[in-house]
UniProtKB/Swiss-Prot annotation:
It comes from Candida dubliniensis (strain CD36 / ATCC MYA-646 / CBS 7987 / NCPF 3949 / NRRL Y-17841) (Yeast). Its main location: mitochondrion. Residues 1-18 form a transit peptide. This is Ribosome-releasing factor 2, mitochondrial. Mitochondrial GTPase that mediates the disassembly of ribosomes from messenger RNA at the termination of mitochondrial protein biosynthesis. Not involved in the GTP-dependent ribosomal translocation step during translation elongation. It is found in: Mitochondrion.
Amino acid sequence: MFCRKYAFQTWKQFSRFYSAVNNIRASKTRNIGIIAHIDAGKTTTTERMIYYSGKIKRIGNVDEGDTVTDYLPSERERGITIQSAAITLPWNQHKINIIDTPGHADFTFEVIRSLRVLDGAVTILDAVAGVEAQTEKVWKQASSLNLPKIVYVNKMDRPGAGFSRTVQEVIQKLETRVVLCNLPYFETNKESDLEFKGVIDVIHQKLLKWNEMDANGNEISVVDIDKTTPELLQILEKSRESMVETLGEYDERIIDSFLEHDENYLKIPPILLDQVIRKATIDNYLTPVFCGASFRNIGVQPLMDGITKYLPSPLETSLPEITKNGKEVPKKADDEKGLVVANDNNLTLALAFKVMTHSTRGPMTFVRVYSGKLNAASNLINTRTGKKLLIRKLLVMHGDSPEEVKSISAGNIGVIPGYETDFQTGDTLVSSAVAKRNFTAKDSAYRLLPIDIPPPLFNAAIEPHTAGDEAYMKQCVETLIREDPSLKVHLDEEMGQVVLSGMGELHLDIVRERLVNDMKAKVNLKDVVVSYKESYVGKKEKEAVITDEEIEVVVTLSHTEDARDYIGQEGALVIEGDNNVILLSQTALSEHVQATIDERRWKCENNLEELKEAILNGCLTALQMGGPILGFPLHSTLVTVKRWNAPVEQAQEQALNLMNASRQAVQSLKNEEKDFSILEPIMSIKVYVDSNDLGEVSHDLTQRCKAMIVEIQDQSTQNLETAAWAKDEATKVYVPPDYTIKKNVSKFDDIANKKIIVAETPLREMIGYLSKLRALTQGRATFDMTLIGMRRAVGNRVDSIVEEYKF
């Protein structure tokens, strides 16, 4: 049997290569995300990838809290990834930009804004747990953006690991075709138990075994699979047959090659298989599957090969939506220059997808450059503010360690350091390769597709220890909001508290920890509560008129079911997060103001658009100031500005007067509690539970959580019963037997014994539910929930909410 060492480059070779990594062209660049359920091994796998690329000399450990990508103290303490860390590394003459994203549901916004700037994703699954709830959620998010994906089945060394079972779940739950690029390889130890030792490379027909004596996983023996290894050869033949049949349905070249090689599945050239798998992956026709055990350093290098071979470059993905003055801009992909926008080779467009403040380095803005080249010591313009800025430095990130670069080319991710208040998440940045370009108003008209921010669901109040601590507390809160746009803040004037609103309990717990432990803010922290709303439910439209000398504003208040109906309507300001609309009627302009415009007697220091914006802002402020019951922000409310007037023929500033008048007008309409109701968030939840625990968990949901059970599904067949395609596909794919599960049949529950409870419940009842669920099921159950919408609270629900908030 021929055996040789796998030819990996040394750390020194990679270090020399890295000095030129920033010059690698776009076609050799891969922007990928690491996404999965919490504890599937995302950060551990990323740490191995960094090590094998030569970026670090020692492998970090999540349990010991010394990994590169989890560098916040709260991340290292909890062993989870909270902020997505960006890192650039070299591999096989390619450049891989990795965004390590969170796996906890509370940090979904981090995942969303990371996916927006990626070209592909690696989905990591726990071979014992299979496809978990958060995995399905993030997979759907990635699919909605048409991101090509590969799957890595991790933790194959664990008792109860089931590679084949997990692959079947991928097909059934994630509804995707698969090709198995490698398979797990086991050997029997002295105790007659199976141990995971390596992988079978289906494409190249090799057995890759990792040397147990090499603690870092660098030494890999590569053995040809042939007649001398009959058991492996049989598995390989079946796997090749399944792969060829799947690929043959996509690309006729596979069928032609199969016929040319005497209908022998093993003789089809690996290079052709790689080409077709790549094309099919980029087309989202199928998903390549790899396996390994990252903690034991097995299987990571083939995964890295798969990233460079199968995931797309920035030139091969869907071109980003770019508008100018609301109209689509022409764009094309160029192999040398990357994306070219508006036929201007010098035009640089970048998206600020993340803003954070480092404890020692200060503000850092993460950007994805879409076209051109962003140069250090050059000017750019922020199209949101219209402000021109000189960019002195540019960085690429190695976890928490920056490396200064002269430029960031199209398709790459980097960092702009400094500029504390100049950037926000979602900003479009315009620059030029021409150093002395003069920016114009036309440059400020460019927009890259903005990032949608989901509405927060939980609140937590904070108070300074003393009046002297208030200023620093506010400064810290402002910093956190710039970093995390899914975090909101408002002042409860009645209680004198600053209220933070976030996506979940853990989200707000981390925010509070950062305030106290990282920022050393002296604050008192209140318990997490649900974010309620109030809504106008009066049967008739209410009208108010505010007059003050020559200032006049007339507004009406009514209920709206769906604010999105007003999107695109002239004069409408739609606040989707709160389902509110402020509508400036087309006939709202008074005859006096219209005559002043027609007769060109306008002397007001504000122009017409500024006055309209002031009126809208005044109405918006009133909505956010809350309703008459408990002061919750208004929801599902339509404010219509019927008429307004101001002495615009006078040389005075009128914007503030109109803003105050419109705010007072809306406030005056919120004087009767009987016209308003409290709304509470209603969640759709899925509880993943063993059959043995089904009764007790269902009873707890209906009695304690006030839930309405919609249905109970069989986890193993939920998609097979509803998707004939998935059933057919699952039977076509060859997967080897899960010998490890057979060995542990007495220790581990069969997946067929799993149930899914689908229910609807008020969010208030789900606070602390995970710990209660684990106590009920000895830690075996998990759950996932999504917001259905806001629903009117009635009866005892109103009483409990009032009791909770009135002191």
